[in-house]
């Protein structure tokens, strides 16, 4: 019995195959040496068959693996060949695209060549045409120049002939007349526009005035008349002062002193220079002399004060008065448009404009100084001398606020009273104390002697602009006894719209202050109980209370020219007058049971 065989491969490295070859060799040796029996041979043959089959399987796997390796190499070769073919195809496509572009460029170049040829031909034709046109223009220019020269010669001859023609002179005269007429027409048109604006303004004013009551219109007319009457003398005095200042300035200019500035504005420098020339002790002596002469001239001044409505202040050479001249003139011209503002407007105006009523002693003092010497300038504080620029700003501010309307009654009730001469006395800081004591004694004696005689009210509520220093001086020198209470007004009001109707007297039995222009609508005199009412003896006493005792009317129709006094007698004194607009209908005075006391109403609506 033979065993299976197995082919030996060269360079065998598989351990199973090597063991199989070794086992076959040993099995063959055993059989050859008869060292194994039959059963052992059969079992060994089965084992060798199985082992040989496994080795053959290994051989088959190795062959399959070798074939797969060969196929992989072939695949790699195919891949490389495919990649090479792709690259070759792309290169071929790129070459084809480049060849196509080259062909297009050739076509474009050929087309450009043809276009350049056409342009060259067109340029040649254009140059030929341009040369032809240039020759034509040159010929035309020559012809035009020749024709122009001929026309110039002909025009010169025509103008020469026209200059000698009369029609040309007539035409020029007509053109001049036409120009003058156009200017006249333009002026008339402007005048027409101005008149139309004036008409519209007056219509609006008349429409507004037509809504007012007759009584209010009469009151305003009288107020405006009195304001005009009081401002005109001041305007005249200001003009005279201005002329005096101009004359003095001309004299100083001739003498080589200070003069007006280049802008012809009234500067304070020439006035201040004149003040500096005099010694301050000499000023004090002159003021003492002028004030001590009041006793001798008091009767004459009293008669002068009684014969006029108000006494104007002396034209002191204060630069502020020079600046106030256009303000006063403007107020006088525009007085017809003054409207009585409300209380809030008056409170806004009060810090800017101060109404300074004049007392009896200040009136006498001013008259004495006017009779003694009117050319002595009032001394100025050193702050004004050192700050002319601030004073010029004050002048401009005063001019800006001058055209504001104000109600004399409201301002008279709200603003504290102060005399401008007393302010001047406060400014005389360098006057010796002995002179001050002498002046105070003389003024006290003079006021006690002349108080029963001088009954004139303040001089038309002089409107003067004062700075902060003067306002402070006024508050320091104000007399506490003259502050108005609820049932008493100032005793020297020349222009008082006393709507309260209460005038403060010296005692309960005396009458109220005698106002030259007192709209005393209720006519209640001094005293809170209203029992002793002197009433008003003003020029326009609308309710006919002319100063008699116990509030009785005198029946004097001259003091009530408008006939407003329908109720001459206030029962029990001090009651509501007829011109009271008392819509609640009580109509009872202060002493009756229904009124409940003295009437202190304004217009009792």
UniProtKB/Swiss-Prot annotation:
Localization of this protein = Chromosome
Task: Summarize what gene deletion causes.
Answer: High levels of embryonic lethality and a high percentage of males among the surviving progeny. Failure to localize syp-1 and syp-3, components of the synaptonemal complex central region, to chromosomes. Failure to form chromosome synapses and lack of synaptonemal complex formation leading to a delay in meiotic progression. Impaired stabilization of homologous pairing interactions. Lack of chiasmata formation during diakinesis. Reduced crossover frequency. Increased rad-51 foci during pachytene indicating impaired DNA double-strand break (DSB) repair progression. Elevated germ cell apoptosis.
Q: Where is the composition biased (Acidic residues)?
A: 384-394, 409-430
Please list the residue ranges that the record marks as compositionally biased, kind Basic and acidic residues.
395-404
Chain intervals with Gly residues compositional bias: 524-537, 588-597
Q: Does the keyword Metal-binding apply?
A: no
Residues modified as Phosphoserine: 269
**Could you tell me what this protein is called?**
Synaptonemal complex protein 4
């Amino acid at each position: 019995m033979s065993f299976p065989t197995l082919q030996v491969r060269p360079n065998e490295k598989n351990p199973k195959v090597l063991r199989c070859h070794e086992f076959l060799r040993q099995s063959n040796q055993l059989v050859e040496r008869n060292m194994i029996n039959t059963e052992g041979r059969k079992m060994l043959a089965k084992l060798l068959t199985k082992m040989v089959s496994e080795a053959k399987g290994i051989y088959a796997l190795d062959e399959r693996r070798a074939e797969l390796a060969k196929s992989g190499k072939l695949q790699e070769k195919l891949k490389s060949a495919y990649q090479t073919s792709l690259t070759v195809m792309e290169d071929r496509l790129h070459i084809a695209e480049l060849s196509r572009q080259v062909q297009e460029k050739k076509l474009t170049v050929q087309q450009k060549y043809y276009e350049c040829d056409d342009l060259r031909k067109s340029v040649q034709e254009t140059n030929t045409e341009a040369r032809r046109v240039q020759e034509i223009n040159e010929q035309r220019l020559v012809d035009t120049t020749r024709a122009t020269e001929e026309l110039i010669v002909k025009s010169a001859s025509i103008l020469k002939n026209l200059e000698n023609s009369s029609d040309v002179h007539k035409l020029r005269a007509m053109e001049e007349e036409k120009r003058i007429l156009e200017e006249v027409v333009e002026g008339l048109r402007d005048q027409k526009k101005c008149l139309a604006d004036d008409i519209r303004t007056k219509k609006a004013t008349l429409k507004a005035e037509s809504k007012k009551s007759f009584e209010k219109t009469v009151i305003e007319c009288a107020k405006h008349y009195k304001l005009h009457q009081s401002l005109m003398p001041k305007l005249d005095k200001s003009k005279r002062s201005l002329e005096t200042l101009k004359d003095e300035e001309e004299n100083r200019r001739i003498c080589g002193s200070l003069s007006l500035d280049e802008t012809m504005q009234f500067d304070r420098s020439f006035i201040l220079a004149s003040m500096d020339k005099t010694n301050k002790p000499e000023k004090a002596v002159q003021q003492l002399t002028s004030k001590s002469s009041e006793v001798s001239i008091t009767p004459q001044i009293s008669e002068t004060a009684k014969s006029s409505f108000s006494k104007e202040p002396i034209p002191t050479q204060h630069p502020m008065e020079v600046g106030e001249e256009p303000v006063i003139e403007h107020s006088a011209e525009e007085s017809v448009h003054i409207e009585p503002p409300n209380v809030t407007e008056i409170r806004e105006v009060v810090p800017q404009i101060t109404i300074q009523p004049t007392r009896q002693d200040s009136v006498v003092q001013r008259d004495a100084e006017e009779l003694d010497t009117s050319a002595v300038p009032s001394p100025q504080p050193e702050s004004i001398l050192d700050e002319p620029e601030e004073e010029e700003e004050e002048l401009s501010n005063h001019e800006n606020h001058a055209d504001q309307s104000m109600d004399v009654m409201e301002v008279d009730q709200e603003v504290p009273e102060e005399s401008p001469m007393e302010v001047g006395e406060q400014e005389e800081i360098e006057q010796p104390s002995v002179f001050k004591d002498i002046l105070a004694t003389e003024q006290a004696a003079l006021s006690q002697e002349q108080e029963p005689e001088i009954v004139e009210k303040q001089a038309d509520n002089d409107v003067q602009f004062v700075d902060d220093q003067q306002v402070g001086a006024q508050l320091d020198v104000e007399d506490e006894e003259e502050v108005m209470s609820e049932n008493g007004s100032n005793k020297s009001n020349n222009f008082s719209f006393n709507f309260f109707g209460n005038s403060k007297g010296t005692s309960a039995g005396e009458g109220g202050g005698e106002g030259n222009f007192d709209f005393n609508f209720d006519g209640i005199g001094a005293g809170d109980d209203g029992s002793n009412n002197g009433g008003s003896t003003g020029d326009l006493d609308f309710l006919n209370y002319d100063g008699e005792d116990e509030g009785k009317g005198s029946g004097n129709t001259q003091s009530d020219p408008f006939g407003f006094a329908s109720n001459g007698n206030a029962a029990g004194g001090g009651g509501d007058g007829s011109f009271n607009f008392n819509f609640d209908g009580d109509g009872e005075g202060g002493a009756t049971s229904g009124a409940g006391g003295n009437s202190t109403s304004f217009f009792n609506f």
